[in-house]
Amino acid sequence: MATLQEVVRSVRRKGGVCNESTGIHIHIDFEPYDAQKLRNLVNIFASKEDMLYQALQVNSDREQHYCKKVDKRFLEELNRRKPTDLQTIKRLWYRDDREYHSHYDSSRYRCLNLHPVFTDNNIEVRAFNSCLNAGVLRAYISLVLAVSNQALTQKSASPRVTQSENPRYTFRTWLIRIGLNGQEFKNCRKHLLSHLEGNIA
């Protein structure tokens, strides 16, 4: 992580810039996943998507085109059928039985993108705005790794959307619960909570 942060700082020092038309995509290895754990991951993202979009300030253009929220039909079918094999999840994701789907398949434009699960053996999270702030980038990566760990270690997860009158407190509580606690992740929490309304007390 320290090496990556230094690379980002070096790019910024050399005059690198980013703009609103770009985003950060974070990929995680699919190797430790199975159908149940993948369903956990989908449900965790579905339940926290509204707060995530607020916390990460996903702009409306990206949300409508390149970083769409979970497909409700996919989510409903996934939890109704509770598949035990990846082939079934693949059919639900693409809505067809074709074996091959192109690299630029339209299904890829989701915040939680499962298209690379079936093409490159990884999972992509597309929710993040571009930035050259090393601390913010660390917060993004730490968040994805923590959510992935929750999906892998939790027996089950509900897709029920989290609602709160104090989203800052609720989101902070969740961050701590998934492992972003203590002094080590203090700055990560600061970055991830900075755009949410409410208080942490």
Feature names for model-found ranges:
Residues 20-24, 28:
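Short, conserved phosphate-binding/catalytic loop or strand-edge motifs used
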